[in-house]
Amino acid sequence: MKILDACCGSKLFWFDKDNEYTTYMDIREESFEIHGKKVNVTPDVVADFRPMPFDDDIYDLVVFDPPHLKSAGPNSIMKAQYGQLDKNTWPDDIRQGMSECMRVLKPTGTLIFKWNEAQVSLKDVLNVIPHQPLFGNRRG
């Protein structure tokens, strides 16, 4: 089984942060401390999720947990851990990211899309992505 975490950040939701079947990708690689908390962003591949450096149809499972904040202060822990969307281009960025996830996913594969509605509603996200989910949380 081949797994891709396309926006791994500091791998917060992973129990096994070094899973042998997983390729961890993020646009940044850095370690720092903010408000007394250590943050380590250590991907296997440093790349943007919009033009992924992978062949088509190679992953059985893709996790797409992109940044969800459009605005954050310079000392925001959430921004430090998860990154930040561009407030003007986020719809196109998310659309491109979802398209890339589907491109690298095998036809029989599974995509897990994780979203936080703190600043952008799920409804707004669903309006810009090219593929609609089969199931999920309908609160948005």
Language-model segments: what does each one mean?
Residues M1-G140:
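Class I S-adenosyl-L-methionine-dependent methyltransferase catalytic core
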